[in-house]
Amino acid sequence: MTMKIKILILFFTVCCYAKGSTIPIQSDKEHNTVTRIDMSEYKTINFDNLVKNISCTRLESNLFDYGITMTTHKDRLYIMGRTIAGNKVVIFDKSGQLVKELTFADALLVISMAIIPDAEELWVVSRFKIINKFKLDGTPIKRVSLPFPCANLIPVGQQNFLVYSGGTCNSRGSIEGHFLALTDFKSINKLFLPKWGKEEWPSAPQNIYAQDEKANNLFIFPNDIDTIYSYNQQKGAVYPFLFLDFHGDFLTKDKHPYGPGEDQEMSEIITKRKYIYSHYSFNQASGKLFFKLVGKREDFCSINLKNNVLYSFNRLFDNFMPISYNPFIGSDGKNLYVLVQEKELAEHYQNIKCTYPAIQRLLPALSLDGNSWILLTIEIKE
């Protein structure tokens, strides 16, 4: 290859980046590719354009101050909620009737949960090492202590689980020097994402995993990392999938404050919005990834997995914006779930026309000072 041709190829590559195109980048020895998404090149849309339908379920009991995350299984809803005393799990049936409230002695240290379909169990993680096992109706089974840190887990078939360690530079939040491990809880089978950065205290991101069961895909978006990963079930491996290029505006692990001045530096980052310092609401629905940015940018993002087109929107249906910092608390692959208090909806629709029949039918029964929880099931267009 002549020098002129090499220069032309280099020039073309640079131009693609400058224009915000997504181009494949070789990421490993097996020629798997990661696609770059220019996060400054997005199409601003109205969220209503993505919505096919909305249905509403009033939950029977108000047992938490706000919802953290939610999962569904068969005819039940499992919501992890937060109170001043810590976290709990509340189980409802699909009609919103209370099935059971699960409270914990170490509620302040309860961090995540997962449904284990093969075992027909609910697992609740606490203290970054304890698994509290329950039957699906909330009946306690046993409490297990793990030999390695665990912030979030998800079953991936064949009695294997993908475990996120908590994301630290030390043994408090890493597994044999890595952030992700494939394990059957008898041994560590594989390790992914070598530890980096200088964070010393583990964290449990909400909605770190986004499943696309229809396409047999699992996506992972860890905290303080500007890359979305995918889990290949056939190979039993995690690969980088989408590199989100924020042009230096995203607070990655290498930029995260540490040491004696960590609290003060982090406070300044938050108050002055120096970086995008967090993301929430990571979910997949109808072939699209969703997440919300916090800090220097506060918008919602959606990436169409068919063509990698990036969309941005600032509010939800009918220009509504819930109080929660984590609006999309869950997804079943087709629907996004939003949990709001009735007074939020009542206040919003005082002077705004409602365009969704299910919400229209609900409005007359809503009170401006009502604290009942309303679960909104938002069906996303294909």
Name what the model sees in each region.
Residues 24, 76-82, 120-126, 159-172, ...:
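Short beta-strand elements that form the blades of beta-propeller/WD-repeat-like
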